[in-house]
Amino acid sequence: MSPTAQEVVEEVTELEPTPEAKKWAAEALGTFILVMSGVGTAVLAGQRVGPLGVALAFGLSLLFLVYAIGPISGCHVNPAVTLGQLLLGRLSVISAVGYVIAQLIGGFLAGIVLFAIAKNLPSYDRAVDGLGANGWGKHSPSAVRGPLGQVVIANGYGLSATIIIEVMLTALLVFVVLASTDQISDIPLAGLSIGVTLAVIHLISIPVDNTSVNPARSLAVAFYQNGAGPQVWVFVVFPLIGGVLGALVYGLLFGRSREMVS
C-alpha cells in the first residue's frame, strides 16, 4: 500500500534537520517564557501563592516547554543544560554558543518586561521588593529584616550553603534532563520528569538563595535589585559547574548513547 501524501510530507519533515536559527529562536522564546512565568509568579504573586506556587510555576512552565519547543531545539532554556549536552557531544561548540546567547537574550527580555509591569504598581519599591533576584547573606530570602524591609537584622544562608546547593541541584537537573532524553530511555513523559524535578529543586532551595540552577534566569533580573549584581557571579559559575558534574555522573553511571531522542 503506497503512503499517503501526508505521510510522505511527515517523513521528509522528520528527515530534514532543523535550521540553527530556528533552534536559537526557540531557545530565546522558551527562556523568555520560563523567566516570565517563574520569576513573574514570584514577583507579582509570590505573597499569594508562596514558595509552593512559585515552584509549580517554574516546574509546569518547563514541563510545557519540553513538549512545545523540545522537538525544535531540545528545550535547554538553561546554559548549564546546554553545557551538559555539549560535553556529551550532542551539539557542536558553535551551536552551543548560539544556544547560550539566545537564552541570555530571552532572559533579559523577560526581565525588561517583568520590571515594566512591576513598576506600574504604586506600592512597588525596587529597593525593598526587588525582582526575584538570587542572593546569599543579607540578600538571602531567609535574611531577617526590620519592619520596613530595608534593614537586615540577621543574615540568611551564607555563600558556602549557596555554592553547595547550586552545584548539587544543578547537577541533579542536568542529570535528569540527560537521562530523560537519550535514545535508550526514550521516555514519552520526559517533560513530566524534568518539570517535576525543577519544581522540587525550587521547593528545596527557594529559602536558601531564591533558586537559580540557571545562569540565564539569574542574569535576567540581577541588575534590577539592589545588591544582587555583585553576587550574580555565584549564580553563573556554580550552576555551570553543576552542569559539568551532572554530565559526568550521567556518563559514568550509564555510559549510554550520546544521542538525544529525536
What kind of feature is each model-predicted range?
Residues 1-262:
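Membrane-interface helix-loop junctions and terminal tails of multi-pass membrane proteins
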